[in-house]
Swiss-Prot record:
Amino acids binding Zn(2+): 145, 148, 158, 161
Position of sequence motif 'KMSKS' region: 330-334
EC code: 6.1.1.10
Protein name: Methionine--tRNA ligase
CDD domains assigned: Anticodon_Ia_Met, MetRS_core, tRNA_bind_EcMetRS_like
Cofactor annotation: Zn(2+)
Binding site for ATP: 333
Gene Ontology CC: one annotated term: cytosol
Length: 677
């Protein structure tokens, strides 16, 4: 084995304002598999996480429920920990950002950064709710669009005409929280001078800490110029007060990543581990953050700059993964595919999903799809039909011979293929390319099953004098099963324990596997059962019911059908419709708009002509996911001068808003510039 490594690993902190769902589980399962693999290899690998427990949303949710914020986050944390435990996530410590450790570390880092001259103060004007005495983020303000007159629009952008504006430009603005009319109010805010770290970050992001595609995307942001980072919020706010600034609180994204350090600090205080050994600037230990692609800027720009400025080490690697889709689409509450972890666990074994995710996950940032039909087929075929089948087909013959395995390797070539595969599979685990690891393992399972089928011990056993050959064949089969379960142990820890009980030995993997001969095994018991389609259907139905119950709990109106909510408009003549020139357009480029919460800037290719269009779809799409898609645009809409530039058209999208927005895409074969009639 190589030298023992000291590794600290984290997953992104789930927000303490809702339940864990299967999207969250992509990351924690991915991380847990990697950690379990490292521990099996003999390394000192520590896995910590915490609830992200601060912010206005948590404060308001607690108020809505009639409890204190502390009571709210304590309940959610208990629910989160139960879900993770039942999904076999092996945290070494799980904490909360609302902790004394996090408060002390946040103060320390802030004071160091401030002493280095990297905290700026300046007054900004914000919308203020005079009834709640609360500064309002744009999402907490609604009113009538000042440009097109559409009602019920958010405070920075109109979803009807895509116009952008300041909250105070809205007609009849109101606070979503109290219904009061907001007023403009000045306040001093504190900023981390991130632009001063541009040179450092350009080097850091190209130094092997990130996947290439992530580094390339960050290069675009760095070249466009960074903005100072507002790290403060005004009271009332649930969080940590900034030292020396009464009534000012750290913005949640300041103390949230510090929560990684705080959780590890709590572990160190409990176990005697050396905190500084892992976090000092010249540490030889390794630090890995597993995160989703939606929070890359916080972890790969703000976080390394903050850490380095405060005299701490930066991450060895930020491992970025994609999003989860279900049956090829975004998770949907109405379709029942927005599945909470607990709903899944009420119906299915956790290892089914752990294996399926592993079979899909690569080292890239690509999204993964939970195709429910494929999920059932793959689990039943791979785990039950292939892996478990090896043991179930051979164990009874060993038991009949007395229960002891033969030391004779009847097919040395086959066994060596299992031994040599260990290094290849280990490399795939190390690189987080679990899908390749699973393919290698299933290929071994196929070899083992083919060998058993060819030898047919059930037929040999019927012929007198074949007792030793039957034992030799089945002993090799059992050893093949043992090798496969060893390689699968990071993915299937629960089944691995059951396999260890059957085999009468621990599954270890610190080097090449040895053959288990002259060893007594125990009676075989079924290790895994098939998934029945009825369980999937029941899970989907329960997800729909849970969504309806939650909507009732938080006093949201019942969901009407789109047609009932927005009836069909008055009839128009064909000539009126013909005035609207709809064209197929290729999205040649898409990028974030600095300072806009809801807008993306799209460059549309009409087949010889390009248009610049601002679209209010940021809540539903990442820019990189749009590039290369075809869509439909209104090509003859009069250009509008907006805050961020000229918009030369409009793309068409449907949906109620938020994450449920869907741009229109033509069928394959439609070309840029074609008219839609």
């Amino acid at each position: 084995m190589t030298n023992k490594r000291q590794i600290l690993v984290t997953s992104a902190l789930p927000y303490a304002n809702g339940a864990i769902h299967l999207g969250h589980m992509v990351e924690t399962i991915q991380t847990d598999i990697w950690v379990r693999f490292q521990k099996m290899q003999g390394h000192d690998c520590t896995y910590v996480c915490a609830d992200d427990a601060h912010g206005t949303a948590i404060m308001l949710r607690a108020e809505q429920l009639g409890v204190t914020a502390e009571e709210q986050i304590a309940k959610v944390k208990a629910d989160h920990e139960a879900d993770f435990k039942d999904f076999l996530i092996g945290f070494d410590n799980y904490h909360s950002t609302h902790s004394e450790e996090n408060k002390a570390l946040s103060h320390l880092i802030y004071e160091r950064v401030k002493a280095n001259g990297h905290i700026a103060e300046r007054s900004i004007t914000q919308a203020f709710d005079p009834e709640k005495n609360l500064f309002l983020a744009d999402r907490y303000i609604k009113g009538t669009c000042p440009k097109c007159g559409a009602e019920d629009q958010y405070g920075d952008n109109c979803e009807n005409c895509s116009a952008t504006y300041s909250p105070m430009e809205l007609k009849n603005p109101r606070s979503v929280i109290s219904g009061a009319t907001p007023v403009a109010k000045e306040s001093v805010h504190y900023f981390f001078t991130l632009p001063e770290f541009t040179g450092y970050l350009k080097e850091w992001t190209r130094a092997g800490h990130l996947q290439d595609e992530v580094a390339n995307k960050l290069a675009e942001w760095l070249d466009a110029g960074l903005q100072e980072w507002d790290i403060s919020r005004d009271a009332p706010y649930f969080g940590f007060e900034i030292p020396g600034a009464p009534g000012k609180y750290f913005y949640v994204w300041l103390d949230a990543p510090i929560g990684y350090m705080a959780s590890f600090k709590q572990l160190c205080d409990r176990t005697g581990k050396d905190f500084d050994e892992y976090w000092k600037a010249d540490s030889n230990c390794e630090l890995y953050h597993f995160i989703g692609k939606d929070i890359v800027n916080f972890h790969a720009l703000f976080w390394p700059a903050l850490l380095s400025d405060a005299g701490f080490r930066t991450p060895t690697k930020v491992c970025v993964h994609g999003f989860l889709t279900v049956d090829g689409k975004k998770m949907s509450k109405s379709r029942g595919t927005f599945i909470n972890a607990r709903t899944y666990l009420d119906h299915l074994q956790p290892e089914y999903l752990r294996y399926y995710y592993a079979a899909k996950l690569t080292g890239s940032v690509d999204d993964i799809d939970l195709n429910l039909e494929d999920f059932v087929q793959r689990v039943n075929s791979d785990l039950v039909g292939k892996v478990v089948n090896i043991a179930s087909r051979t164990a009874k013959f060993v038991q009949k011979a007395g229960g002891a395995l033969s030391a004779n390797i009847i097919n040395e070539e086959l066994w060596q293929s299992f031994v040599k595969a260990g290094d290849v599979i280990a490399a795939h685990y190390e690189n987080r390319d679990y899908s390749k690891a699973m393919r290698e393992i299933m290929a071994l399972a196929d070899l083992a099953n083919e060998f058993i089928a060819e030898q047919a011990p059930w037929a040999l056993a019927k012929q007198e004098g074949n007792e030793q050959k039957v034992l030799d064949v089945c002993s090799l089969g059992i050893n093949c099963f043992r090798a496969i379960m060893t390689y699968l142990k990071p993915v299937l820890p629960q089944t691995a324990v059951a396999a260890e009980e059957f085999l009468g030995t621990e599954l270890t993997w610190t080097g090449p596997l040895s053959f288990l001969g002259e060893h007594t095994i125990n009676k075989f018991k079924p290790l895994m059962t098939r998934i029945e389609g009825e369980k999937i259907e029941a899970m989907i139905n329960d997800s729909k019911e849970a969504t309806a119950a939650m909507a009732k709990t938080i006093a949201e109106p019942a969901a009407d059908s789109p047609l009932a909510k927005e009836p069909i408009a008055d009839e128009i003549e064909f000539a009126d419709f013909a005035k609207v020139d709809l064209r197929v357009a290729l999205i040649a480029n898409a990028e974030h708009v600095e300072g806009a919460d809801k807008l993306l800037r799209l460059t549309l290719d009409l087949g010889g002509e390009t248009r610049n269009v601002f679209a209010g779809i940021k809540s539903a799409y990442l820019p990189e996911d749009l590039i290369g898609k075809h869509t439909i645009m209104v090509a003859n809409l009069k250009p509008r001068k907006m805050k961020f530039g000229m918009s030369e058209g409009m793309v068409l999208a449907a949906g109620p808003g938020g994450k449920e927005l869907y741009i229109l895409e033509p069928h394959e074969g439609a070309l840029p510039g074609m008219r839609v009639m």
